[in-house]
């Protein structure tokens, strides 16, 4: 709640800002639309992992380093919802978006990018297809 209030305050003040989300909820759609109505250019950077198990491993690593835990079933649910919402709700409304594969040890790799509902380039067709296919399951 505190973060949402801060985001509303920054929006009202016309400040530039960024926030992190799994996209597992639809609640940011209205926020994006409100921001755009106020003249904001909304950029979405989506850091994708090919499986929910990789997300579970990342959380386990974070916990071993003193971070907070998230139950595996919650991670799986957020993972599925986030991927489904990515191209059905969020990329169609964001002014610019990029999807990155964040699973490689040598850094992130661009998968695709676009402007609203127009895909400008699919850099990694195999990964992009995995994302699209996951939504259909």
Residue ranges and their predicted role:
Residues 1-40, 73:
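Conserved nucleotide-sensing/catalytic segment adjacent to the nucleotide-binding pocket
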Residues 7-8, 86-88:
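Short, flexible, glycine/charge-rich loop motifs used to bind or transfer phosphoryl groups or to couple energy/partner
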Residues 18-20, 44, 98-101:
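A structural signal for short, well-ordered beta-strand segments and their strand-loop junctions
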Residues 24-25, 48-54, 103-106:
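Conserved nucleotide-binding/hydrolysis micro-motifs of P-loop NTPases
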Residues 32-35, 58-61, 113-114:
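Short, glycine/charged-enriched secondary-structure capping and boundary segments
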Residues 39-41, 93-94:
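A generic structural signal for alpha->beta connector loops
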Residues 40-86:
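A glycine- and Lys/Arg-enriched "phosphate-lid" helix/loop adjacent to the NTP-binding pocket
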Residues 88-137:
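NTP-dependent small-molecule kinase module
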């Amino acid at each position: 709640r505190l973060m949402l209030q801060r985001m509303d305050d920054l929006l009202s003040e016309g400040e530039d800002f960024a926030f992190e989300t799994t996209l597992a909820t639809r609640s940011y759609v209205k926020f994006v639309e409100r921001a755009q109505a106020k003249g904001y250019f909304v950029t979405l950077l989506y850091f994708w992992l090919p499986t929910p198990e990789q997300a579970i491993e990342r959380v386990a690593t974070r916990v071993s380093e003193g971070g907070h835990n998230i139950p595996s079933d919650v991670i799986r649910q957020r993972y599925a919802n986030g991927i489904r919402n990515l191209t059905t709700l969020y990329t169609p409304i964001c002014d610019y978006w990029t999807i990155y594969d964040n699973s490689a040890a040598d850094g992130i790799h661009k998968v695709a990018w676009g402007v609203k509902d127009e895909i400008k380039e699919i850099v990694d067709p195999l990964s992009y297809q995995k994302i699209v296919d996951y939504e259909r399951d």
